Amino acid sequence: MSALRVVEILRRMEQGRTRPFLVRAEDDALYVAKGRETTQRGLVAEWLCAHLGRALDLPIPPFTLLEVPAELVAALGAEGGALGASTAFGSRLESGVQDFAIAQLRNVDVALRRRLLAFDWWVENADRTLSELGGNPNLLWRAAGDALLVIDHNLAFDREFDESTFFATHVFHGDASALFEDWINWTDAANRLRAALPSFDEALASMPDSGIGSTPRRRYRLV
C-alpha cells in the first residue's frame, strides 16, 4: 500500500491517550494520524491489527500510511515532535459518530461482539474496557443504522497481557462463556482466526522498508 502525502495538519486532538493529529491527505480525506508519540511498536500494532481486523470482517475504518512532510511538522513548533516527519498511521475520520456507551451494548449484533472479543484475545489487546463505572472501549457508534466502528490497537501484542484481567474488563466480556466454552461457537471463531492469518503476512510485506515512525522494517519485533 502506497503512503498518502499529508498536505495539511489541522490540529492536535484532545481524545485518546496519545492525542493524535487531524490531518488532510492528498486524496482530500481527513485522517486521524498517529506518529512518534504512539511509539514505533504501537504504530506497527495498529497496522497489523487493522489488516487482521478487516480480514475478520470487523468494522474498522479505512486506513493508510501517511507521509508527513518536515515543513508541516516544523510549523507546529514544539508539538510537532509528537507527530514527527516520518511515516504515520492514518485512520480515516468518520462523520456522525460518538464514543460508544454501555447503553448501546444491547444494540450490537451478538456475532460481532463475539468476533471482536475473540480478536482482542487473539492479538492480546486489553485496551477495550467498559463497565457501569466507565472505561475506554476504543469503539465508536453511529446512531444512524446502529453501526459500530472499531479503532485504536496500538497497545495490542502486549507482553504483559493477563487473560483473567482481560475477561473481567473487556467491553464484551459477557459473551466470553458463550464463545470460549461452546464447542460450536469456538470452532467457528478459531476457523475465522486461522483464515485471517495470511493478512498478517500481507501486512508485514506491505510495510515500507523505511519503516513506520522511522524504524526500519527489519527491526520490528512484536513478540
Label each region the model flagged.
Residues 1-102, 115-126, 137, 143-146, ...:
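Conserved ATP-binding subdomain of kinase catalytic cores across diverse folds
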Residues 142, 146-223:
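C-terminal catalytic region of ATP-dependent kinase domains
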Residues 45-47, 72-79, 105, 130, ...:
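General "foldedness" signal
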Residues 50-55, 107-113, 167-172:
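Short, low-complexity, polar/charged sequence segments that are solvent-exposed and flexible
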Residues 101-132, 148, 178-190:
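Conserved kinase catalytic-core helix
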